[in-house]
């Protein structure tokens, strides 16, 4: 019996080891590429990878059943016409311990629209016709970015489009697939809802004497109704594709979108849906740029504390709501505060902490009411003291995080 048990344990271990050889990390198996020239197909420098694949491949972000798995998703840089192919060196035998390989191709087909290429020749034929691709919608803004190596500058355009633009619906179906790889909680929107607005970033470049355009990124904005006669545009999705990140395109896009809506008297303010920390930093930078020269945000006014005039002027001039205006004030006040001066530093720190402590105070009041019903008075007081101690630590930690974020905004502002 002992020999049999030993055999079964060893057999199970051997099987698990064998199966592990057929597990692939989908974050590295999926290879993305934006193709401008035929030689880009073989250029590994052009390849980039997803940050997330859990929506298709589960929380462990793995595909089972393959060795050397490669999931190729190559896009023509402008039109995003797609080459999709699955490659691997070996596949698990269907009879191997009653297991089957994951349907990798089926999972990818869930998010990419039909009409993609499966062989290179068809893809290259479409690439030859790329000169016919032009940006959709209305041109809102043109800007340039200098080359990181110096000398050359690159030209970019931001357009506003909608579903009435010829070919845009199909283009958007291809574009939105990138969301699944780079936004953790991404989902596709209802494009038949006319309240969606689309803002697109393109690079303008030359190829063999012709002018072409490459997709850089995009933003979707939903226009909510605000009683009785206003709207509140809310940023829903924003993505700058990996090869273009770190070049300032996010700030250009967000600033352009804000300036677009500022021109409409019916717009109350501009918000964002579940903003990430990186988005908040970007918005901080853009809104501070807007407000830094407003009279209500002068050095003298900033040192006096946040005022209703600041909130009103930020809303009237730039459609910034009171909560965001308060954050702008905190950044600009840090800019004019001498942090080496003990009194100025103390005044600034207390001002920020007064805002941060408000939700804690409410929580404390609610907790005290509940504990009076459930605990003796002495125990309640003791637990409240512990709670307060923890709150002070959390407040200080949060304050330091904010100051660090604010300093980065100020440093970036100084580089403008």
UniProtKB/Swiss-Prot annotation:
Phosphorylated by AMPK at Ser-187; phosphorylation increases HAT1 activity. The keyword Manganese does not apply. The active site is at residue 273. Residues 59-61, 222-224 are annotated as: Interaction with histone H4 N-terminus. It is found in: Nucleus matrix; Mitochondrion. Belongs to the HAT1 family. Histone acetyltransferase that plays a role in different biological processes including cell cycle progression, glucose metabolism, histone production or DNA damage repair. Coordinates histone production and acetylation via H4 promoter binding. Acetylates histone H4 at 'Lys-5' (H4K5ac) and 'Lys-12' (H4K12ac) and, to a lesser extent, histone H2A at 'Lys-5' (H2AK5ac). Drives H4 production by chromatin binding to support chromatin replication and acetylation. Since transcription of H4 genes is tightly coupled to S-phase, plays an important role in S-phase entry and progression. It catalyses: L-lysyl-[protein] + acetyl-CoA = N(6)-acetyl-L-lysyl-[protein] + CoA + H(+). The modification N6-acetyllysine is found at residues 6, 12. Its EC number is 2.3.1.48. This is Histone acetyltransferase type B catalytic subunit. Keywords: Acetylation, Acyltransferase, Mitochondrion, Nucleus, Phosphoprotein, Transferase. One of its GO terms (cellular component) is nuclear matrix. The record marks 196 as: Interaction with histone H4 N-terminus. The modification N-acetylalanine is found at residue 2. The keyword Phosphoprotein applies. One of its GO terms (biological process) is subtelomeric heterochromatin formation. It is an enzyme of class 2 (transferase). The modification Phosphoserine is found at residues 187, 340. InterPro entries: Acyl_CoA_acyltransferase (IPR016181), HAT1_C (IPR048776), Hat1_N (IPR019467), Hat1_N_sf (IPR037113), Hist_AcTrfase_B-typ_cat-su (IPR017380), Hist_AcTrfase_HAT1_C (IPR013523). The lineage of its organism: Eukaryota, Metazoa, Chordata, Craniata, Vertebrata.
